């Protein structure tokens, strides 16, 4: 059988999707006996071999780009594989600095960073950082013998400083505050952004500060609680960095604050101590009051009301102790434990010659008066 001409074969190949052969999840791979030139007798037909979607060969993926950041000019991290795509094997990073002749002498990274057992970055110490020289990096796949095109980076544009520290507030006048802070890098190479708001504001107010490490707020209200925070960036005098540092710890001033709170804006240990002691003290006071109330209920008799006086006669038959609620032991302790003897005294008319000072117990008549007795408690 003669083969159809080459244009006709191409037309048939383009019509395969119309015949129900799906080419989207398939790749055309040569079988090893194909004839690109169309010579007869060499088996120039292609076989369709399918590869399931989602199981792409990582060797066909492009190498990821390298992203570098210099942290406070103390160390540098260059990372890759920031996307969710699978990484082709363990990649190696080669770096160097471009000289005046344009000759890039690259060397391999000495301190790799790993993620799930696969290289994901390279760490550089302070001595390896040349801030104002062109930094050259190249990512390579040693197994597939592939290389990424060289990347040229300006490290002065990739500096991220540390967050400002030691925020301090002081009063310049009755209604004016000054906020100051410090950085762990040269102040003339940093610009700052100050944010502040009161407890009655919903949004932050921003103020840019260049080359200085202080900020003045001319008008404040002592009845409000103010919050301040600062962040820094490498300024255009030393570089063109676009990344800000992290925000500093906030500092507060205003109502419900004191001088100690301004100097030490946050004291977690004191806050935790107050949060524990105040509830415990309140609960202890409540329990003590309940105990005192119960003790008084048991020891103090109830005071009867006037409307219950009828019960003293009708229900208790005049028994005051039972009606008043006095305990039996208390009633017995109130009764006397002695008896009185009567002393019979009789008056004898005085005789003549007797003065008024005669004793009433003197015997001036033939009748004897009963003896007099004094009150003595019974033994």
UniProtKB/Swiss-Prot annotation:
Residues 349-370 are annotated as: Disordered. Gene3D superfamilies: Immunoglobulins (2.60.40.10). Keywords: Cell membrane, Disulfide bond, Glycoprotein, Membrane, Phosphoprotein, Receptor, Signal, Transmembrane, Transmembrane helix. It is found in: Cell membrane; Cell surface. One of its GO terms (cellular component) is cell surface. A motif (WSXWS motif) lies at residues 244-248. Common subunit for the receptors for a variety of interleukins. Probably in association with IL15RA, involved in the stimulation of neutrophil phagocytosis by IL15. This is Cytokine receptor common subunit gamma. It comes from Bos taurus. The gene is IL2RG.
